[in-house]
Every structure is written in C-alpha cells, then in structure tokens.
Amino acid sequence: MVLMLGNYIRMGTNLFPLWSVLVGIIALVEPKSFLWFGKDSIGFGLGVIMLGMGMTLKAEDFIRVWKEPKVIGLGVCSQFLIMPAWGALIAYAMKLPPEMAVGLILVASCPGGTASNVVVFLARGRVALSVSLTLASTIAAIWMTPLLTSWYAGHYLPVDPWALFRGILLVVLLPLTIGVGWNRFFPKSARQASAYSPLVSVLLILLIVGFVLADKKELILENWEILTGSVMILHFGGF
C-alpha cells in the first residue's frame, strides 16, 4: 500500500508540466478558480516549498559543494552572469511592457529550482551535482537576485533591492535552514515528510501559477504572443 502510494506520488510529481498547462488554461478561462489563493499566500507557499527542500538536505550536501569548486563555480557564474543579461537583452529587443520586462528579468535572475533536479533524474544525469548546483545557486541568490534585478530592471520600474533581499531571507533562507535543522535533529519525521514534499511543492506551485495567471488575465491575453515568445527564447537560450 505504501509502495503504491509512493508510485502515485512520483507519477503525479513527474506530470508537473501537464498539470501546469491544465492549470494555466483553467486560470485564464475561469479566473475565480484561483483568485481565492491571494497574493499573501504566495510567500507562504514558497516558504513551504523551501522547507520541504531543506528537509532533504544534510550537512554532507553542503560539504559536497566544495569538493568540485570549479564545476560548481562555473555553474553558478553561468546562472548569474549569462541568464540575467540574456533576459534583459530579450526584454529590450522585444520591447516588453515594463511589468513583463521586470518579470522576465526577475525569472532570469533566479536560481535553479527543485524541478531541475527532477529533470536531471529523469535524464539519468548526475543528480548529486544538480542538487549541489541548486543549493549553491540558491544560497548565492540571496544576494545576487536582488542586485541583478535592480541593476537590469531598475530603469523599467522602481526596484527595491533591500526589500527583495529581506523577502528572500524570509521565504528562502529561513525555511531552508529550518528544514535542514529538522532533518538533522528529527531525521525520521523529516524522512517521512520528504516522501510527500515533492507532491506538496508541485501543488503549491500550481496554485501560485494559477493565481498569477488569473490575477493578470487581461494583461496576459493582450500580450500572450510576445510573452510566450520571450519566455521560450529565454529558456531555450538557457539550454
């Protein structure tokens, strides 16, 4: 029974791209389905996701980052040097509206997430290296994301880097630290919770995506062609 439940959880998690498309369609057709989630719930949802990620990490994971400093350093530098500049170039070349330009640059300035680790696992790549890169870039993002967003997007709209910094501390660093501590002192319960955390993370991401699309329905429908094109170019360029 437990094994079957685990298989269902993995299946539901691996179908994340499909759920994202379905949620996007529902949010644009029937916005009320997701507007209840609310802006204030986004930070809470992201915090829970980072808490779940922290519960899968141990002190050894942090030590492993330093065992391949050149590879990790190259990955982190590529993440924060190439992607933000690429996002800013796309926003400028495609003349995106200010809100979309800032959003694209912010996405380009963020670290890799847990979804990248899942993709590496499915591709039978080096999962340990992917986790190390995600961990290193997440830590670096505490300083780099506010700085780069302010630098590249500040002329579109006012960007408060210190507010971004404080938000990342509360939403990323604090729950991540709590999760690591939980795994350190209460490994059994952390292991049990970690079995469900990927699915919980997927559900929360879907709620966040659904709310954002529902909340910005008019803007998205008015600019869907240029928005879709810019996001696809950003991610294809990242690969």
Task: Enumerate the predicted regions with their spans.
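Alpha-helical transmembrane segments of multi-pass small-molecule/ion transporters
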Residues: 1-239
